[in-house]
Each structure stands twice: as structure tokens, then as C-alpha cells.
Amino acid sequence: YVEVSEASIDWTAPEVLQGLIEDMAKQYALATDNAAADALLAGTSQTTGNVDPADPADWIAKVYACAITILSNGNYLPDHLFVSSDVFAQLGQLSDSSDRPLFPQVGPMNAFGSMNPGSRESTVFGLRLVVDTNFAAKTTIVGAASTGAFRVYETQKGSISIDNPSTLSRTVAFRGYFAPKMIDANQFMLIPQA
């Protein structure tokens, strides 16, 4: 919560209150995203062997190992690849034996996907890429996310305020209910790095 003086509310243009509420909404979003990332990582109990982050063939082997395990556990194929920002950079730097990007951004032919550093619409190994800075370093999770095996329940209540006549101020807060839950851990696998 934040306490704002009546004078600050009355004498600012644009109104300081709107900026504070927007900032609190962003902080709420970051906190809930962090909770979801932590819950997904903590709830993912299956792992492959360590991947060599610079070896494209090892990445392919590990992703397919995850796919076959997820398929065997529930008859689903994975559809998402969740990674930390450092793994995002590792994947973007992978190249084939001719030094061509493994995931080119323009005109990919026979590529395993397409990605670029400025887009959230990336496909890696045929999986939708989700990059989150709230994951711990070296996080890579392959998952069948569209199955609902990991869910997030949220009611965003928004801002609330109360006037404080004794201090000629207003206390403002931003709140909501948020509960991430791993429903079926068999639909997710972690690819660790040494």
C-alpha cells in the first residue's frame, strides 16, 4: 500500500494517483508471475539428464526424451517450452554444423523453429517458447500446458483506497487472489544443466 497526501493528489497533473495505481498493478503482475514460475518449477518433478547447452544434438535428444515420457504418462504431446532468460540466450545462439542458426528468424528451411530476441512469438523444437525472468537460472521445462495440467486461479480485485482525515492523505492498495497449482506433474519435465 501507499499513502499519498491530499496535496499531491490535488496539485499534480497528470494525477499522481493514477500513476501509483498503474505502478502497483505492475508490481502485482510481477509478484503473481513470480509465484506462478516458482510453482511450475517446484511442481515439475520429472527430469532428463543434464543437457550440454552448446550442443544442438544434445538439446534435440533431451527434448524428444521429454516428449516420449510425457506421451507415455498421459497420451499427450508437449506444446510449450518454458525457459529462463539465460537459456533463451543459449537457444538463440545454437547453430548447425554449417554455423547457420538452428532457429532462424527469416525464411527458415528445415529448421526446428524460429525465434528472435525481440519477439514473444517464437517456436523452438516445434514447441511454443515461454521466456520468464522469474525462473531460476538454467531453467528449461518441457510441458503439455494446454492440457490444463498446471493451472492458475486468479481474481484481480484491483485498487482500493481509504481517506485518512487525521493526516489529510489517502491510503491506496492493489490486491487480488492468486493460486497456482500443479494438477498433473506427469505432463511436465525439467531439462537440467550442470
Where are these regions (language model features)?
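Alpha-helical scaffold segments that mediate packing/assembly in large oligomeric complexes
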Residues: 1-73, 190-194
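Generic structural signal for alpha-helix starts
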Residues: 5-6, 144, 184
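Short loop/turn segments at secondary-structure transitions that flank enzyme active sites
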Residues: 8, 30, 34, 87-89, ...
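Short helix/loop capping segments that flank catalytic or ligand/cofactor-binding pockets
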Residues: 12-13, 90-92, 181-183
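Short, solvent-exposed amphipathic alpha-helical segments in soluble enzyme
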Residues: 19, 96-100, 188-190
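Intrinsically disordered or highly flexible coil/loop and linker segments, enriched in small
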Residues: 30-37, 76, 97-100, 181
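Extended oligomerization regions of viral-like shell subunits
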Residues: 49-176
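Structural signal for terminal/edge beta-strands and the immediately following C-terminal loop/tail
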Residues: 176-194
